[in-house]
Amino acid sequence: MSLIAHFDTDRGPIRVELAPDKAPLTVANFVNLARRGFYDGLSFHRVINDFMVQGGCPKGTGTGGPGYKFEDEARNGLGHERGVLSMANAGPNTNGSQFFITHVATPWLDGKHTVFGKVIEGMDVVDGVKQGDTIRSVKIEGDADAAVAAKADRVAEWNKTLDANARA
């Protein structure tokens, strides 16, 4: 069964088919954060026309994250074509919560950023996103439990960090 992320944004809905077979750790992280409501109310803090829209920063500046980092799965056979969901990072193995969706093919990012999904509906919405637009929610459809269970030890570790940060 496919795993779909439904983004509800100010501009409308975006549906992305996730690729747990190609990026299991990245998908487990994204699904876990989405199910916890981490992305709800965050903005697209960086929008570059004819390149990409970026979101997932709790500070809204591009400097925030979930409080942990994890390794790349960038050499998974998925390339940066138009409409892919990929992890933003600050260098090798610095993935957290920030992601981007491409407007155009960006092959120079291949091997440097982990592609983990593809827009299947709402590319017109992606193309219309403006900086500061809100991600109202991200909901997961499909066997989210299996995606998280595949990396249960890491998800448990991440959730300890997220829970500690929520109490701080």
Task: For each feature predicted by the language model, list its residue ranges.
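Cyclophilin-like peptidyl-prolyl cis-trans isomerases
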Residues: M1-A168
